[in-house]
From Swiss-Prot:
Enzyme Commission designation: 4.2.1.20
Record-stated family: Belongs to the TrpB family.
Organism in which the protein naturally occurs: Rhizobium johnstonii (strain DSM 114642 / LMG 32736 / 3841)
Cellular component terms per the entry's GO annotation: cytoplasm
Record-linked NCBIfam families: trpB (TIGR00263)
Keywords from the named record: Amino-acid biosynthesis, Aromatic amino acid biosynthesis, Lyase, Pyridoxal phosphate, Tryptophan biosynthesis
Pathway field: Amino-acid biosynthesis; L-tryptophan biosynthesis; L-tryptophan from chorismate: step 5/5
Stretches that traverse the bilayer: none
Cysteine-cysteine disulfides: none
Residue numbers bearing the N6-(pyridoxal phosphate)lysine modification: 99
Cofactor(s) this protein cannot do without: pyridoxal 5'-phosphate
Quaternary structure note: Tetramer of two alpha and two beta chains.
Record protein name field: Tryptophan synthase beta chain
Amino acid sequence: MNETPKPNSFRSGPDEDGRFGIYGGRFVAETLMPLILDLQDEWNRAKNDPAFQAELKHLGAHYIGRPSPLYFAERLTAELGGAKIYFKREELNHTGSHKINNCIGQILLAKRMGKTRIIAETGAGQHGVASATVAARFGLPCVVYMGATDVERQAPNVFRMKLLGAEVKPVTAGSGTLKDAMNEALRDWVTNVEDTYYLIGTAAGPHPYPEMVRDFQSVIGIEAKEQMLAAEGRLPDLVIAAVGGGSNAIGIFHPFLDDPSVKIVGVEAGGKGLQGDEHCASITAGSPGVLHGNRTYLLQDSDGQIKEGHSISAGLDYPGIGPEHSWLNDTGRVDYVPIMDHEALEAFQTLTRLEGIIPALEPSHAIAEVIKRAPTMGKDEIILMNLSGRGDKDIFTVGKILGMGL
């Protein structure tokens, strides 16, 4: 682990250059720099503008359905026989995941900037659906770049995006997953800077995206903190979330970072195991490098070439992680651990049977970690987990693996 000094606050970053310690920054083509700086200026104005915040709050309540509930998982808690388990139910949001929180915020920014075309990248298709949804709501054309592999394994979401009026462009380069989709979206943006807004779906990319996405997603943790105090009269002992690029995780983690009594764990995609290359555990098994405009932990070879990762879950199938997570790892504030495909699949089925909630494969990784940790904790202790998405999109993948023809 890189030793990083502990700051006075874990919530004060990034600095004016968009850095969290040695991570983050703005590594972009010269043609994009003026646009990135425009975006940063607009973001700084918007976040201090009461009218912008009021519109965001109004759409959150009436379009997304916020606040999302805090749910005590009674049967899972009883089954595991340890800590009380609570879920932040982000899968109940409009479009079925946390992704919409960020999309609403960014499309309001795009409108403020006078942009007339939206582009986005997507892995699991949840961010693509959320982007297409907000584009439809605000009457803007939308192009979604999606790896060809993901187009195949996320058919329901591809259909949803098309229904919503978005153009889905399959990307066959590389392994045809999220990294490749992001590369294509960046290429599009460079050539269409005047009219196009790039709606990034995770807490990565060049500054100000990691900060912006985190702030739009922090509504999760802010609500959860209030709800937990109302339900239990105190904060949780442990907060857990799955981490791909890391937007759902930073959204629930950030409001708790300066509460020393709260332990925080991020769960990476361990895929088929960390020995080979078939995983996406960037922090557990990667090293710092530069990808998609920011310095962060990446899966790369000794020459700095980005490896093709693997995860059963399309949304975690990314060979990097948001820069703030890299910094939180190095400061020791957050622990990052891997969960394998088979453990996530088991957790998916366990939650479905015990609580009547079909989770997405992404948060199923976090559920698997909850299943490991809860029995080792006291019955008076509390776990809070971010249930970031619903599993409708994954039933074909799971059905195939379990040998159930759909």
